[in-house]
């Protein structure tokens, strides 16, 4: 039974909106409204109210106190039974509650004025996670890394959620371009996001798009680029222009003997992503590959060394790319970083 104000589009529970340079983000809501009267006796019965002039209002409130951040704002009614509103400058922070209500001529105290709400919404920074298994998270050792309100994840299901390990698990997945064939484990990104949130004082969102075993050619549109297309689809569906790309990849190049061209191909990948998003200075925060402890293979070691050097050089020759080493991190197995790392 639809009664009162219904939110149909615009924001989801746990969603983090990327702030702009001014430290704010626009949030748009739209939906329908229904004039309904409740019976005076139980069990409740619902009956339609004759058409009347309705006023729909919405506000942004702090979830912790109920205090209005943006006060009740009258919504536009483009046609009878529909409404929409845009809050053009919701400040960085949260978590927020988006709330609606209605009034209308002839209200008698029993007719519904209730409205839908969207809980746990924040404005802050959103990071997209790309690369292969050490970005996706494959280690399965125990990790003390609790979820924390204010850190959210856009799951492959297309739903925003409280961020928790494993970030990229595929329950109900609708974005299947990076559909893992087995369950991922933990990754460093939840810890990363919690640290950022505490230092910066506003929410952080994560969009995991990494795929285990992925060579660079699956990301580079000049070769294959299927994973980049999948990533852009996820970002586009939620109109996300991320704060930065978190990138851990390169292990596969050793097995494909393609390390010598890594720098040129990574440069092409970065350029393509920036052009597609219209963000020419989009930062890429990259992690050098660690090591492989499976076998003693001098050819593989050489390939990995070339990749590491290419990753180091990328931070010098591509603007807004930075690189951190990982060779001192402990391994969970022959190739994946452990919880200790």
What function would you assign to each model-found segment?
Residues 1-341:
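Cell-envelope and extracellular/periplasmic
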């Amino acid at each position: 039974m639809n009664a009162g104000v219904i939110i149909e589009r615009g924001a989801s529970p746990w969603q983090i909106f990327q702030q702009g340079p001014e430290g704010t983000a626009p949030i748009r809501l739209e939906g329908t409204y229904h004039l309904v009267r409740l019976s005076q006796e139980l069990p409740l019965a619902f009956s339609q109210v004759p058409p009347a002039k309705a006023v729909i209002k919405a506000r942004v409130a702090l979830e912790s106190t109920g205090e209005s951040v943006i006060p009740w704002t009258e919504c536009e009614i483009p046609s009878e039974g529909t409404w929409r509103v845009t809050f053009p400058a919701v400040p960085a922070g949260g978590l927020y509650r988006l709330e609606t209500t209605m009034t209308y001529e002839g209200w008698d105290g029993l007719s519904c004025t209730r409205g839908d709400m969207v809980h746990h919404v924040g404005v802050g920074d959103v990071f997209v996670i790309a690369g292969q298994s050490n970005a996706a998270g494959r280690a399965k050792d125990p990790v003390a890394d609790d979820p924390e309100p204010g850190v959210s994840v856009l799951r492959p299901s297309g739903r925003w959620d409280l961020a928790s390990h494993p970030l990229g698990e595929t329950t109900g997945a609708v974005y299947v371009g990076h559909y893992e064939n087995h369950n991922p484990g933990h990754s460093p990104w939840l810890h990363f996001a919690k640290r950022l949130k505490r230092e910066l004082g506003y929410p952080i969102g994560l969009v995991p798009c990494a795929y285990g075993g992925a060579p660079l050619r699956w990301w580079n549109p000049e070769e294959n680029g299927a994973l980049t297309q999948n990533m852009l689809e996820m970002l586009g569906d939620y109109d996300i222009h991320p704060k930065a790309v978190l990138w851990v990849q390169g292990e596969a190049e050793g097995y494909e003997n393609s390390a010598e061209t890594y720098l040129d191909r990574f440069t092409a990948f970065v350029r393509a992503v920036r052009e597609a998003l219209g963000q020419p200075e989009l930062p890429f925060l990259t992690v050098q590959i660690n090591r492989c402890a499976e076998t003693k293979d001098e050819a593989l070691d050489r390939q990995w060394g070339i990749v590491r050097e290419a990753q180091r050089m990328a931070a010098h020759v591509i603007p807004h790319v930075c690189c951190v080493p990982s060779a001192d991190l402990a391994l969970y197995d022959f190739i994946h970083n452990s919880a200790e790392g």
